[in-house]
C-alpha cells in the first residue's frame, strides 16, 4: 500500500514536474478548465473516489495525462493529486439536503394524516362507548382524563411554547427579533461580498480551511445561517411551504457546500451567488429601522432591490456556466469571464442592446439567456420606468432643516405665492433694520414655480424652502418647529371664501400648537369674527407673543381713522412698512412725501437720564435734541403689569427701563434715546455725535428720582426745594420697599408750575422744559396713575352723565352704545334722506348682495363710536347699498347710535344726492364682491366706477348754502351767536363743494395696479408701487396689501401691533375681543368710575393753522416751534402734516388735493393751509354745554362741513373759565328751538 501510494505520488509528482508549465496556462485556456477524454474522465472519477476513500495504488486505472489536470495542486494543500473536479459533491450535498428534507416532510405529513384518520375513527367509537356506559358524572361534567392524555397535553404544550419562543426570536415586532433580522441580512450581504472576492479565483480550487481567512469567515456566517434556519423551521406553521421558500432554497444551496469544502479541502464557487436574493428584503429591513416611512420610498426601494437582486443572481449563474463549460462537452467549451463582465452582459441583454463584445458560448449559458431575456426584458421595461418616475417625483425640497448654532429661524407657512413671499421678504430683510440674524424657513405642500424658486435662490443665505404641510407632525419635525423662534402663517387675501381661509389657518394653528404648545404664532386672519375661534385653543396665549393680525379689522380701522383725519391711513401704513429713502432734488410734493415715507416705527429703551421726567418733557427733548419723535411708552404699573400708553400726558413720570415708541428713519437713530447722557451730551448739537459714553451712571433711589422730578416741576434747586419733607420721604421709603420701580407719588409734588411755565420761553433747560397740559389718562392706565379722580374735576360732564339707569357706553366704557334697534327703524327712503339735510356725516357706499362674503362693517363703525368722543361729536354714518347685504351685517351694528341705511346702489346719483354726499366729511367706497372675480384687473371695477361717478357729479352752490344754513347746527364748542366768546379757534371754513372732485373720498382696492384708474390727472406709471402713487399719497386709496408689512413688524416687536390696533380700532382690547366672542355683539354697561375713566384717552385729530392759537406759526413758521407749543400748552403731540399738493407753487388756483408728510424736521416751514396730524387729549368739559342738546335729538347732526374732522383748540384762558354764561346757554337753546 505504501509503495503503491508512493508510486502514485511519484507519477503524480513526475507529472506535476513535467507539466508544471501547463498548470499556469495562457489566458485562452485556464488550467482547471481543461477537459478529459471519455476514458480518462471515467478513470479520473474512479481514481478520485478511490484516493479520497483510501490510499491504495492506482494501478487498476489509467493515469491522466499532464494536460488533463484540472485543479491546481500545491504541497501545502492536501487535495486530489489528480486535480479532478468535485463539483458534483457540492451540488449533491445541496440536492440531498433539499430533497431529503422534502421527502421527510411529505412522509411525516402522510403518516400524520393516516394517524389522524385512524385516531379520529377510534375516538368516535370510544366516545360512543363512554356515552353508552354512562361515564359522565351525575352533575353532567365529564370525568378526568387518564394519565396518558395528560402526558400528551403536556407534550403539546411544551412544543407550542418552544414554537412560540422561536417565533418571538425571529419576529420583527420585538427588539430581539429586529436585531436578529437585521443581523442576518447584514451577514448575508457579507457572504455576498465574500463571493464577489472569490469570483476572481477559479470556479473550483484547493484550499486549506485553517489557512484561508475568507473560508473561515464564510464558515462562521453559514453556521449562523444554519442556526437561524433552525429557528425559522421551528417557528414555521406550515413546514412544507417553509421548505419551498426562496430564503430556504438559498440556504440549501449555500450552507451545505461550505461544510463539504472543509471536508474536501477544496472550494467550489457554485451557487453562492444566490445570496444576492437576500437583497429583496432590503425594504423590510429599512422599515424595521424606521428609515422608510412613506409609500413612495417603500415602493422605490422594493423595485430597486428586486431589480438588482435578479440582475446579480443571473450574472452569477452565467459566470458559473461560462467558466465551467457544458458537462456533456467535457467542459471544453468554457470561456474565462469575470463576474463583472457577466453583470455587464446581463444588463445589455435586458436592455436589448446586445453589443456583441461579450456573449455566452456554452449551451447552458445560451439556454439560460433565452429564458432570461423573456423575463428580464419584461422586468426592465416595467421596473426601470417606474423607478425613474418615482425618483423624478421625489420632493426636491423634502429634506430636513439643520439648525445653525447661534442663529434663530422662523417658519413661514400658509399662503405661499410669489407675491406674498416677495412682499414678506422685502419688508423682513429690509436694510433699515439692524442685521437680521434670522433664517426664514418656508413650508408649503406645493413645490414652488420657477419664479418663486428663483426668488428663493436670490436669498439663499437666509431663506430655505421645504415641501410639506404643517398639518403633518413629520413635516413640523423636519423644519424643527420646536426650536423655531416663531411661526408665521400667511393668509390669502384674495380668496373667494374668507371664512374657509380663516378655518384653514386656524387648523394650522391647532396643528402647530398641538405639536409644540410653547411656539409663538403670528397668523393673518381675514374676518374679525373668526378671531374668537383662536381663543378656544388652550395653548393660545397673547401674553406670550401669540398674535392674530385681522386684515378686515385693521383695513376698516385705517379707513375709519381717515374719516376722522383724512390721510391718516396712508401715514400709518407707511409707518410700519419698511421703505427705503428716495431722494428727489426737485421741489415737488413727491420730495416732501418721500422724506416722510422713509420713517418707520421703532422701539428702544429710554436712558436713565430721562427717569423722573414727565412724558411731554422727554418727548420735547427727544424731538429737539435727538431728532426723534416719541409717541408712546410701555409703562409698568404698581401691580407690575405692562401697558402701552399713547401720549399719556405730563402726569406720568418716566421709570427706569421704560420702553419708548419712536418714529425715525433708521434703527440706529433710535439708539440715541438709549445712549443719551445729560452729563456727556447736554452740550452736543449734532445728534449724530450722541453715542455710548463711558461714564458710569449711578442708579438713583426712588426718593432721589422723585425729588429731582419735584424740583423740575417747581423750578428750584434740590437744595432749596422743600416739597419732599421728612414725612414724605418716610412714606417714599415704605413705597420703595413695596414697589421699587414705582414713581407715581411724584404726581402731587408741584402746584405752581403753571404760572412759571407761561412766563418762561421754551428752552432745553431742565427747569424750563417741563410742561403741564392737564390731567390725561390712557385707556389702559389704572386710575391710580391719575393725578385727580376724573369725577372730581370741576365742570366735568361725567358727573351729570352718571346715571345708574341709563346705558350710554358698552360694558368696557370704550365705545358709545345704544339699545339694539330693528333695521326697519334706521332705513331711510330717498325722500326721507333728502329731508333730513345731512351734513358733516360719513357716507359708506357698499357693494354686496345676499351671497357676498361679509366684510365686517362693525370694524368700520367701532372707531367712529369710540367713547373718547362726546356724543355730539359723533359723525352720523349713512350706508348706501343693498338692503339684503346690510341685513346680514346689521346684527353687529344695531348697538351703535347715529347709523342710518339708504337702500339703493352707490352708482345711482339720485341716491348719492339724497344723502348730501357733497356735504359729507368722508365718502367710503367698499365692495364685498371683489374676490368673486378671477380677472384681477376687474376685481375693483365697482369701486372704481363708483369713485369716478362721484367725482364727475356737479352740485349747485346755492343749494348747499341753503341746506347748511337751514340746518342751524354748530360745530363742537362753537357758538354761532357769539363767535368772539367762543372757546374754539382755528376753525377752517371751506366754501361749499360744487364738483365731486372736491368730495373727500377713500376707495378700497384689492389689486394695487388698479390705483392708476382713480385719478385722471396723475402721471403714475402702471408699474409704480402703491405707496408711490398719488391717490395713496393723498389718502384717497387704500389697499389691503399694505398690511402685509405688519407680519414682520409684529415679529420683531409685538408691541407694534398693539400700538397700531389701539390707534386705529378706537380702543379694542383682548378683553373686549373675548366678550365679543361670547355674544358677537357689544354689551351695554352702566357708567362707573372705572368705565368712565376709560374715556380719558387720546385720539387722532387734524389741527388747522388758518386760524386759532397757532395762526401765527402758519405763515412761515417752523414746524418745531408748533410741535413744542402744542405739546407744552395742550399736551397735543404733532406727528405730521396734511398739505395741499400745490402749496409749494405760487399759482392762484391750486388743486384741492392734499398729501401726507410724516414727521417733518424741526425747521420745516409751514403754510397757512396746512392741517396738522396730532394726538389730542380727551377734554372732559368739551361736551358739557352740548350734552343736553346732543342727547335730546336722536337724528340731529351736530357739526358743519369740516368742523368735526378739523379740530380746534380751546384757549388757555377759557380752560380756566369753563362754565358758560347764561346768555350763551340761552342762545344755544334758541338755536335748538329754531332748528326744531
Curated annotation (Swiss-Prot):
Residues 1220-1236 have a biased composition (Basic and acidic residues). Residues 1-86, 200-214, 261-264, 322-335, 359-367 are extracellular. Changing residue 381 to S: Activated at more negative voltages. No effect on inhibition by HMIMP. The keyword NADP does not apply. Its main location: membrane. Phosphorylated. Phosphorylation by kinases such as PKA and/or PKG. In smooth muscles, phosphorylation affects its activity. Palmitoylation by ZDHHC22 and ZDHHC23 within the intracellular linker between the S0 and S1 transmembrane domains regulates localization to the plasma membrane. Depalmitoylated by LYPLA1 and LYPLAL1, leading to retard exit from the trans-Golgi network. A motif (Selectivity for potassium) lies at residues 352-355. Widely expressed. Except in myocytes, it is almost ubiquitously expressed. Residues 39-60, 1186-1211 have a biased composition (Low complexity). Ca(2+) binds at residues 1012, 1015, 1018, 1020. Residues 407-549, 839-983 form the RCK N-terminal domain. Residues 336-358 dip into the membrane without crossing it. Residues 1-21 have a biased composition (Gly residues). This is Calcium-activated potassium channel subunit alpha-1.
Amino acid at each position: 500500500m505504501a509503495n503503491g501510494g508512493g508510486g502514485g505520488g511519484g507519477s503524480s509528482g513526475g507529472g506535476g514536474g513535467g507539466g508544471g508549465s501547463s498548470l499556469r496556462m495562457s489566458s485562452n485556456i485556464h488550467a482547471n478548465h481543461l477537459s478529459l477524454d471519455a476514458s480518462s474522465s471515467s478513470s479520473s472519477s474512479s481514481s478520485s473516489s478511490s484516493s479520497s476513500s483510501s490510499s491504495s495504488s492506482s494501478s487498476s486505472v489509467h493515469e491522466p495525462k499532464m494536460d488533463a489536470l484540472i485543479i491546481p495542486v500545491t504541497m501545502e494543500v492536501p487535495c486530489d493529486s489528480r486535480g479532478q473536479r468535485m463539483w458534483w459533491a457540492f451540488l449533491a450535498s445541496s440536492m440531498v439536503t433539499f430533497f431529503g428534507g422534502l421527502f421527510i416532510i411529505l412522509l411525516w405529513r402522510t403518516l400524520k394524516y393516516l394517524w389522524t384518520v385512524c385516531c379520529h375513527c377510534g375516538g368516535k367509537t370510544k366516545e360512543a362507548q363512554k356515552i353508552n356506559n354512562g361515564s359522565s358524572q351525575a352533575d353532567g361534567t365529564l370525568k378526568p382524563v387518564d394519565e396518558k392524555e395528560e402526558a400528551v397535553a403536556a407534550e403539546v404544550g411544551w412544543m407550542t411554547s418552544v414554537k412560540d419562543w422561536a417565533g418571538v426570536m425571529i419576529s420583527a415586532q420585538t427588539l430581539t427579533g429586529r436585531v436578529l433580522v437585521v443581523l442576518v441580512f447584514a451577514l448575508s450581504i457579507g457572504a455576498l461580498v465574500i463571493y464577489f472576492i472569490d469570483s476572481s479565483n477559479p470556479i473550483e480550487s484547493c484550499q486549506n480551511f485553517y489557512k484561508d481567512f475568507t473560508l473561515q469567515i464564510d464558515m462562521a456566517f453559514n453556521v449562523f445561517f444554519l442556526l437561524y434556519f433552525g429557528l425559522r423551521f421551528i417557528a414555521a406553521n406550515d413546514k412544507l411551504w417553509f421548505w419551498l421558500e426562496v430564503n430556504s432554497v438559498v440556504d440549501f444551496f449555500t450552507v451545505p457546500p461550505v461544510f463539504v469544502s472543509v471536508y474536501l479541502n477544496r472550494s467550489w464557487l457554485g451557487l453562492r451567488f444566490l445570496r444576492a436574493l437576500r437583497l429583496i428584503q432590503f425594504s423590510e429591513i429599512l422599515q424595521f429601522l424606521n428609515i422608510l416611512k412613506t409609500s413612495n420610498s417603500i415602493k422605490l426601494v422594493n423595485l430597486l432591490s428586486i431589480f438588482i437582486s435578479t440582475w446579480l443572481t443571473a450574472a452569477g449563474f452565467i459566470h458559473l456556466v461560462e467558466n465551467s463549460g457544458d458537462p456533456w462537452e467535457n467542459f471544453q467549451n468554457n470561456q474565462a469571464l469575470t463576474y463583472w463582465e457577466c453583470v455587464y452582459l446581463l444588463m445589455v441583454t435586458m436592455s436589448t442592446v446586445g453589443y456583441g463584445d461579450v456573449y455566452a458560448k456554452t449551451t447552458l449559458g445560451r439556454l439560460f439567456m433565452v429564458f432570461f431575456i423573456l423575463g428580464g426584458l419584461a422586468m426592465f421595461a416595467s421596473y426601470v420606468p417606474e423607478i425613474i418616475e418615482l425618483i423624478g417625483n421625489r420632493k426636491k425640497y423634502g429634506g430636513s432643516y439643520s439648525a445653525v448654532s447661534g442663529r434663530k429661524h422662523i417658519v413661514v407657512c400658509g399662503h405661499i405665492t410669489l407675491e406674498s413671499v416677495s412682499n414678506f421678504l422685502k419688508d423682513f430683510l429690509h436694510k433699515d433694520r439692524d442685521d437680521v440674524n434670522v433664517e426664514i424657513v418656508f413650508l408649503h405642500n406645493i413645490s414652488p414655480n420657477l419664479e418663486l424658486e428663483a426668488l428663493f435662490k436670490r436669498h439663499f443665505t437666509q431663506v430655505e424652502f421645504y415641501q410639506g404641510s404643517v398639518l403633518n407632525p413629520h413635516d413640523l419635525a423636519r423644519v424643527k418647529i420646536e426650536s423655531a423662534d416663531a411661526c408665521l402663517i400667511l393668509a390669502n387675501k384674495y380668496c373667494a371664501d374668507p371664512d374657509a381661509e380663516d378655518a384653514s389657518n386656524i387648523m394650522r394653528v391647532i396643528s402647530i400648537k398641538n405639536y409644540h404648545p410653547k411656539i409663538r404664532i403670528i397668523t393673518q386672519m381675514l374676518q374679525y369674527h373668526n378671531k374668537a375661534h383662536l381663543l378656544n385653543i388652550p395653548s393660545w396665549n397673547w401674553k406670550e407673543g401669540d398674535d392674530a393680525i385681522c386684515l378686515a379689522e385693521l383695513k376698516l380701522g385705517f379707513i375709519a381713522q381717515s374719516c376722522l383725519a383724512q390721510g391718516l391711513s396712508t401715514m400709518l401704513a407707511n409707518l410700519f412698512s419698511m421703505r427705503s429713502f428716495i431722494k428727489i432734488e426737485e421741489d415737488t410734493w413727491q420730495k416732501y412725501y418721500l422724506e416722510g415715507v422713509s420713517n418707520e416705527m421703532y422701539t428702544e429703551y429710554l436712558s436713565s437720564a430721562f427717569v423722573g421726567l414727565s412724558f411731554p418733557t422727554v418727548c420735547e427733548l427727544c424731538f429737539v435734541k435727538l431728532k426723534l419723535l416719541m409717541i408712546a411708552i410701555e409703562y409698568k404699573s404698581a401691580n407690575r403689569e405692562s401697558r402701552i400708553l399713547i401720549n399719556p400726558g405730563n402726569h406720568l413720570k418716566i421709570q427706569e427701563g421704560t420702553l419708548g415708541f419712536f418714529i425715525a428713519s433708521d434703527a440706529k437713530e433710535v439708539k440715541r434715546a438709549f445712549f443719551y447722557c445729560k452729563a456727556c451730551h447736554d452740550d452736543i448739537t449734532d445728534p449724530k455725535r450722541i453715542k455710548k459714553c463711558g461714564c458710569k451712571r449711578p442708579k438713583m433711589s426712588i426718593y432721589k428720582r422723585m425729588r429731582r422730578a419735584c424740583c423740575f416741576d417747581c423750578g428750584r434747586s434740590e437744595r432749596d426745594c422743600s416739597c419732599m419733607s421728612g414725612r414724605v420721604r418716610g412714606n417714599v421709603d415704605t413705597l420703595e420697599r413695596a414697589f421699587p420701580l414705582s414713581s407715581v407719588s411724584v404726581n402731587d409734588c408741584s402746584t405752581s408750575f403753571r404760572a412759571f411755565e407761561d412766563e418762561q420761553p421754551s428752552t432745553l433747560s431742565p427747569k424750563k422744559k417741563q410742561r403741564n397740559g392737564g390731567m390725561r389718562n390712557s385707556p389702559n392706565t389704572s386710575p391710580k396713575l391719575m393725578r385727580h379722580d376724573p369725577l372730581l374735576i370741576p365742570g366735568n360732564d361725567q358727573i351729570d352723565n352718571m346715571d345708574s339707569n341709563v346705558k350710554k357706553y358698552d360694558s368696557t366704557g370704550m365705545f358709545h352704545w345704544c339699545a339694539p334697534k330693528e333695521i326697519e327703524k334706521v332705513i331711510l327712503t330717498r325722500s326721507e334722506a333728502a329731508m333730513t339735510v345731512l351734513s358733516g356725516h360719513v357716507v359708506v357706499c357698499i357693494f354686496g348682495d345676499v351671497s357676498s362674503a361679509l366684510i365686517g362693517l362693525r370694524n368700520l363703525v367701532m372707531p367712529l363710536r369710540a367713547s373718547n368722543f362726546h356724543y355730539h361729536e359723533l359723525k352720523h354714518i349713512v350706508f348706501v347699498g343693498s338692503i339684503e347685504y346690510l341685513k346680514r351685517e346689521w346684527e353687529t351694528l344695531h348697538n351703535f347710535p347715529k347709523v342710518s341705511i339708504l337702500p339703493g346702489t352707490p352708482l345711482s346719483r339720485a341716491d348719492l344726492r339724497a344723502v348730501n354726499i357733497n356735504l359729507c366729511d368722508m365718502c367710503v367706497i367698499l365692495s364685498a364682491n371683489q374676490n368673486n372675480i378671477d380677472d384681477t384687473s376687474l376685481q375693483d371695477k365697482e369701486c372704481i366706477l363708483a369713485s369716478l361717478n362721484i367725482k364727475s357729479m356737479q352740485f349747485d352752490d346755492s343749494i348747499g348754502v341753503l341746506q347748511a344754513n337751514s340746518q342751524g347746527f354748530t360745530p363742537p364748542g362753537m357758538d354761532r351767536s357769539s363767535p368772539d366768546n367762543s372757546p374754539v379757534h382755528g376753525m377752517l371754513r371751506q366754501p361749499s363743494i360744487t364738483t365731486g372732485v372736491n368730495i373727500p373720498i377713500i376707495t378700497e382696492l384689492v389689486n394695487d395696479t388698479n390705483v392708476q384708474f382713480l385719478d385722471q390727472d396723475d402721471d403714475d406709471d402702471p408699474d409704480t408701487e402703491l405707496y408711490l402713487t398719488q391717490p395713496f399719497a393723498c389718502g384717497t386709496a387704500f389697499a389691503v396689501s399694505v398690511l402685509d408689512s405688519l407680519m414682520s413688524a409684529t415679529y420683531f416687536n409685538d408691541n407694534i401691533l398693539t400700538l397700531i390696533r389701539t390707534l386705529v380700532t378706537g380702543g379694542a382690547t383682548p378683553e373686549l375681543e373675548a366678550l365679543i366672542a361670547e355674544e358677537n355683539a357689544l354689551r351695554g354697561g352702566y357708567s362707573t368710575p372705572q368705565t368712565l375713566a376709560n374715556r380719558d384717552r387720546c385720539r387722532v385729530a387734524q389741527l388747522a393753522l388758518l386760524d386759532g392759537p397757532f395762526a401765527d406759526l402758519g405763515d412761515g413758521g417752523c414746524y418745531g416751534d408748533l410741535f413744542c407749543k402744542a405739546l407744552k400748552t395742550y399736551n397735543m403731540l404733532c406727528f405730521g402734516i396734511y398739505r395741499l399738493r400745490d402749496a409749494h407753487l405760487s399759482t392762484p388756483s391750486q388743486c384741492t388735493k392734499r398729501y401726507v408728510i410724516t414727521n417733518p424736521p424741526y425747521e420745516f416751514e409751514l403754510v397757512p393751509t396746512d392741517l396738522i396730524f396730532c394726538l389730542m387729549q380727551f377734554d372732559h368739559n368739551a361736551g358739557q354745554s352740548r350734552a343736553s342738546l346732543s342727547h335730546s335729538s336722536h337724528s340731529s347732526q351736530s357739526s358743519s362741513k369740516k368742523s368735526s374732522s378739523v379740530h380746534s383748540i380751546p384757549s388757555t384762558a377759557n380752560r380756566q373759565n369753563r362754565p358758560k354764561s347764561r346768555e350763551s346757554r340761552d342762545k344755544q337753546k334758541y338755536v335748538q328751538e329754531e332748528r326744531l
